[in-house]
């Protein structure tokens, strides 16, 4: 399945290599990409651009991925968010669901899993 414009994905990670890896996974699928290195930058981009989905690292400087999702929800409503983290536990899963995260992916991410989950989130929210 190939994505059609104008779906835009915001990739937020404080690690430039991780951001670029995620961009290299989703951009060839036909998605526009925006990149942020912090929760604050992600909020600014979402406030000024049409963002259809967020791929967000859980551990960011200042605001966590979950805190960022909560603020975005107050500003724009629910935007499907896929959290990415190295430490999944039951409490994180509960908090992610309470903030309406679409899912939580474990690091290191699999290219095929990212593509599948992004497509499923876009289908669920926009089709």
Spans of features found by a protein language model:
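Two-component/phosphorelay signaling modules centered on CheY-like receiver
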Residues: 16-34, 99
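Residue-level signal for the "D+5" position in two-component response regulator receiver
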Residues: 35, 60-63
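Acidic catalytic/metal-coordinating carboxylates
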Residues: 38, 64-67
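Active-site beta3 strand of CheY-like receiver
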Residues: 49-55, 60
């Amino acid at each position: 399945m190939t994505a059609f414009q104008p779906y835009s994905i915001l990739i937020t990670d404080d690690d430039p290599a991780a951001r670029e890896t995620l961009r290299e996974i989703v951009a060839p699928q036909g998605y526009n990409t925006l990149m942020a290195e912090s929760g604050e930058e992600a909020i600014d981009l979402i406030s000024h651009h049409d963002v259809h989905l967020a791929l967000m690292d859980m551990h960011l400087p200042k605001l966590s991925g979950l805190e960022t999702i909560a603020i975005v929800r107050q500003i724009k409503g629910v935007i499907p968010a896929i959290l990415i983290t190295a430490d999944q536990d039951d409490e994180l899963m509960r908090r992610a669901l309470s903030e309406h995260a679409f899912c939580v992916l474990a690091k290191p991410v699999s290219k095929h899993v990212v593509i599948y989950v992004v497509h499923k989130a876009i289908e669920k929210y926009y089709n």
